[in-house]
Amino acid sequence: LYNFPKFFLQKNYLANKNVYNVELNTPLLFSNKSSKLLFYHKDLKSTEKNNNPRNIDSLNAVLNTITLKLRQRNIKLIVLPSPDKYDMYYDYIAEKKGFTKPIFFDLMKAQKKDYIYIDSKAVLKANIKSKQDIYYYDDTHWSPVASKIIANKIKGEIENNK
């Protein structure tokens, strides 16, 4: 009963120890027509680490090193980082106060890459207004809708980089 008032008084809150429940600015993103976003608390917590340019520079350097080693064996590296649900739907959060903007994909975009890079966030964002349930409403995983979009993108990259 202690936490009961927050369901009526707060728009954005940590619903329990693990899940945030925040207002969206549209009810069109999920097939259940909810204007709420449920996401795992560690999505928000990991944003600080994922937004650190030094971490991204280091990651990219390691991936470029791996790419060079794989090239010696005639293997091409495809890197496809996945946005978490918080990152994917951040732009649709109605009140962003207290919610750090995820910039991992912006930082990755600026890197010089020797590997094949698929910006899965950009690929999925291009479909978010025309296809509902990119991520499941009540889960942290992307749905079969997103899986099909990403599979087609991977297939295209493989065909273009033979």
Q: Residue locations for each model-derived region?
A:
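Extracellular glycan-modifying ectodomains
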Residues: 1-162
